[in-house]
A protein has these predicted regions:
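Short aromatic-acidic-glycine turn motif
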Residues: 103-110
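Bacterial N-terminal signal peptides that target proteins for export
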Residues: 21-30
Length: 226
């Protein structure tokens, strides 16, 4: 930048005898160069800062009436969408999965996806939905919508009462290696069941009372070495 300023000062002195019109042209040209250099410098600083200040956020996506109507035509009774924003570093990864609990105890992990193809998220949508096939084959169809596609599986279900709810109520910043739980489906064969909702991305309180719990989570972590 000092070299650019010195070049401009020398040329201004050298061309002090130039006519008014030419001088105005020369000043405008110099101003253009200075602005270009400043913008380039600012861009360079921003580029250097972004890798060390990685930030990933997630928040619930509120569907419009039209979107809700369209979803209702697909047969998906319960579904929630979320918006992702931020950039992953080269050695980072986002994992999406569903955790299953029986009587409050962890049983297994389903629909786990990792090694995300996308690394930059700008209002990128993810979702988790459930189709209850209780009247057909007593199963739940689980839908895991991720930035790069859709994963599905079936899970046996003999619950007679269930609830489905969000586990976050505002934009949340992901912390590395700390899962955020986004939605919870709770089921029981009893007549009563506590709501499975929450606000802070933690496991719901009603999980211990539910005979079956299916929880959707996202985890920011290191990329698994192949």
């Amino acid at each position: 930048m000092r070299i650019a300023k010195k070049w401009i000062r020398n040329n201004l002195m050298k061309h002090s005898s130039i006519g008014g019109a030419n001088m105005r042209y020369f000043k405008n040209y110099c101003l253009f160069i200075v602005i270009t250099l400043l913008l380039t410098g600012c861009a360079g600083v921003e580029t250097k800062k972004s890798p060390s200040n990685s930030k990933l956020t997630i928040e619930s996506y509120n569907m419009s009436e039209k979107e809700t109507l369209l979803i209702s035509k697909t047969g998906v009774e319960q579904i929630e969408f979320f918006k992702l924003n931020g950039t992953l570093k080269e050695d980072d990864d986002l994992q999406f999965s569903v955790e299953v609990f029986e009587n409050g105890k962890f049983k297994e992990e389903l629909l786990k996806t990792w090694d995300e193809l996308e690394t930059k998220y700008n209002d990128s949508l993810i979702s988790f939905g459930i189709i209850d096939n209780r009247d057909e084959d007593h199963s739940l169809k689980l839908l895991n919508g991720i930035p790069s596609g859709l994963a599905t599986t079936f899970y046996s279900n003999n619950m007679t009462t269930s609830s489905f709810g969000l586990l976050i109520d505002e934009k949340m910043t992901l912390e590395k290696n700390k899962p955020i739980y986004l939605t919870a489906w709770l089921g029981t064969t009893k007549n009563e069941l506590r709501s499975g909702g929450g606000t802070t991305g933690e496991l719901p309180l009603g999980i211990e009372e539910a005979e079956l719990a299916i929880i959707y989570k996202v985890l920011w972590t290191d990329k698994e070495k192949k």
